[in-house]
Amino acid sequence: TMAGNIFNVLIVHPALPAPSVKALIALARARPGELNYGSSGTGAADHLSAELFQVMTKTKMVHVPYKGGPLAMIDLISGNLQLMFSTVPTAVGLIKGGKVRAMAITNSIRYPLMPELPTVAEAGIPGFAVNNWTGVFVPAATPPAVVTRLNAEFVKVLAMPEVKKRLIDNGIAAVSNTPQQFAAYIRDET
């Protein structure tokens, strides 16, 4: 069962002279190879988000991989990095505190607790969408009746208003689907 979609955000150092995604693209094109971005490691979702951004915008920036997102975030706050992609839960306190500036949500929909923040697609890169998700798995040999029961219980829990609120407050939109839908989604994405 898919349990939720995790919201991600493009964030920049507050001093970066680009007030919008379009301005960031223009700056990166004007200064190829001069802007840098951090990631939690080579091949991680935030790294791949930045690579997709570069491909879709025909820009070139320097990748600075770290051994974890918190180390990259420290360098973004200190100004050693210009930008990075992050999960909303990791970045929201820093955004609210003015330590970093949010430019856009990478998901295909806006984050409900920051409705003023456009998606990257809305901000100037049509078709850009990076959606991370979380789900519940069981061993392949689990009896179908057990899978059905577990799914029903997870769907009930995910439908509870207090659970939905707790998830969205932490940057996750609750999703309830069937095991078959989840399996099809995974097949389609891989």
Predicted regions and their residues:
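Conserved, function-defining micro-sites of small-solute handling proteins
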Residues: 1-190
